[in-house]
UniProtKB/Swiss-Prot annotation:
GO terms for cellular component: cytosol. The gene is orsE. It comes from Emericella nidulans (strain FGSC A4 / ATCC 38163 / CBS 112.46 / NRRL 194 / M139). The keyword Endoplasmic reticulum does not apply. The keyword Metal-binding does not apply. NADP(+) binds at residues 43-46, 180-183, 203-206, 272-273, 339-340. This is Dehydrogenase orsE. Induction: Expression is induced by an intimate physical interaction of the fungal mycelia with the bacterium Streptomyces hygroscopicus. Expression is repressed by VeA and MvlA via histone 3 acetylation by the SAGA/ADA complex.
Length: 348
């Protein structure tokens, strides 16, 4: 008989407390995953610190799981008990504790999960789920939605990634600021698989990672001439400039983003935090909200074969913080302190 434990958040600002939790059951369109690894995202630290998106207390949060299918819902056909999977847990939308990653067993929507190839470990695979859905939300929404009150989502209306090798070039170029971050790395890979040229901005020591993800050129964010160099690279590409995805999203990066956009005649500014309140009329700015069924075809048809072929890789690589639910607090602390070109992972 399975028993469940979870790392509970009882109040904003508290450390997580490991305690018993009910073993969840899978409803229609759901699977229950027996977690072998979970990952830490910056979003999780905000949920811990200020309770953003928390709908009931105590709660279980966390977005990334990898493990084996424990149970499938009555209408689920893509998965069976024992399958190795990765999944995007969506407690931040549902508010239900059983939908949080930081537990031994988690409910995951079947349309936000994929079979993990045998050649990929759980600790590698778990870096991908949240980033996959976030990347699709950066690139493929056709109409602006609501990210939070008063802030719309971006709508770049770009096509889904393709398994074709080589993929047909789309004739478009996208700049990604923060190319070595988790979402920046995956957006680079998903965009490249859609035939979009990516020019990345990252730390000088992370150039190789951005290039592994598919960026054709990478520029140092500390270079005082980075804005002019990026503008020149876009112009030299001869491609249609789509805009910028800012995976760092600070006042300093926004200042540079807007100069780049001004010099290139405008475009989209998609960001991981609320964008500047005032932007020029030729700039369409939005904040991504990384839970959207726009990603369903990518989960259903692309993720597993793309992982098998190497079309997408589990990058940036994981750093294992520790083993057991107790280690999640340490992971959250390290995430707040800042990491570069890695994703923090806890084994269970």
């Amino acid at each position: 008989m399975a028993t469940n434990q979870a790392a509970w958040l009882t109040k904003a600002g508290n450390d997580l407390e490991v305690g018993d939790a009910p073993v969840p059951t899978a409803g229609p369109g759901e699977i229950v995953v027996k977690n072998a690894a979970v990952a830490i995202n910056p979003l999780d630290t905000h949920m811990q610190d200020v309770g953003v998106f928390v709908q009931q207390w105590p709660t279980i949060f966390g977005c990334d799981v990898a493990g084996t299918v424990h149970e499938t819902g009555p209408d689920v056909e893509r998965f069976k008990k024992g399958d190795r999977v990765i999944g995007h847990a969506i407690n931040l939308v549902t508010g239900r504790p059983q939908d949080g990653a930081y537990a031994l067993y988690t409910v995951v929507p079947a349309n936000k999960a994929a079979i993990l190839p045998d050649a990929i470990s759980f600790t590698d695979g778990v870096v991908a789920p949240f980033a996959v859905e976030a990347a699709v939300c950066v690139l493929s929404l056709k109409e602006p939605g609501v990210a939070m009150p008063g802030v719309s989502t971006p709508a770049l209306a770009l096509p889904y990634p393709s398994l074709d090798d080589p993929v047909k070039p789309l004739g478009k170029v996208l700049v990604i600021w923060g190319g070595s971050s988790s979402v920046g790395s995956m957006t680079t890979q998903i965009a490249t698989a859609a035939g979009i040229q990516v020019i990345a901005i990252s730390g000088a020591h992370n150039f190789e990672l951005s290039k592994r993800c598919g960026a054709t050129e990478v520029f140092d964010h500390k270079d005082p001439e980075v804005v002019d160099k990026v503008v020149a690279a876009v112009q030299k590409s001869g491609q249609e400039f789509v805009g910028i995805f800012d995976a760092v999203a600070t006042p300093d990066t926004y200042t540079s983003d807007l100069v780049i956009l001004e010099k290139l005649g405008g475009g989209h500014l998609a960001a991981v935090h609320p964008p500047p309140a005032e932007v020029p009329s030729n700039v369409k700015a939005g904040m991504i909200f990384a839970v959207n069924d726009i990603a369903t075809p990518v989960w259903n048809d692309f993720v597993t074969p793309a992982l098998e072929s190497g079309k997408i890789q589990c990058l940036p690589p994981p750093t294992i913080v520790g083993k057991g639910l107790e280690a999640i607090n340490e992971g959250l602390k390290r995430c707040k302190a800042g990491v570069s070109a890695t994703k923090l992972v806890v084994e269970l």
